[in-house]
Amino acid sequence: FASNHGVVNQGVSPFPPEVTQQMVWNFEAGGAAINQLCETAGLELSVTALDLNRPTIDFTTAPAMDPDEVVHAMNAGASAISETCDYLIVGEMGIGNTTSAAAMSMARFGGNASGWVGPGTGLDQAGVTHKAMIVQAAIDRHGDDQEDAVNLMAAYGGRELAAIAGAVLEARMRRIPVMLDGFISSAAASALTVGNRLDALDHCMISHLSPEPGHMRLASALRKQPFLDLRMRLGEASGAAVATMLVRAALATHNGMATFAEAGVSNKE
């Protein structure tokens, strides 16, 4: 899922917002990392762009979205899952969305802004410090007492984050296991746990631990153990695609490996 964020006007990313559209074109042309990983892992790729020419509002000045926009994006995420899907990985593209993910995580689980933000797409230390100030300003404006997932995402989220939450919720309804990517998709899914309903994500796994400082805190808060720690920070669901190959290996071993009795191997005495 892809969308743009108004908070980039605050200088929280070294890349301009038009990169989001350019990367969507790259996905569609088959030239991105996720295209190669999906082919290798035997995954079908679907790309959903959400109003790229209409960024969310800068959430330091007002809520990022109104509740109707959040619900619309969640429905788009739910609708993106094909009828034949039996395993879902989710990822995102959106310049500025690590700032949104950090703000959502802080609003949901508390702590200091400096503990949730990181370099994202390549900020230096001064940029990370500035980013923490932006997240803190947003929390000061909107508060951390959002009573449900929709209000939380309306205050701080992006359309692609809401779409991920909608897809994760739809997968829960359809009993489809979900492999989350990194920090951003984990933050999007965490919105569904408002009210301390961590069991809302019982069908979800976290594929890998992102180097973004907030991801370890978030995974711990969600009581999830990421499968891999490869220092990946690309996004695009790339970590989830790599972890899928581990899942395939586990299934192949489970289904094909003979028991000691079947293989005629003597057991311990």
Tell me the role of every PLM-derived stretch.
Residues 1-269:
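N-terminal loops that bind phosphate or other acidic moieties
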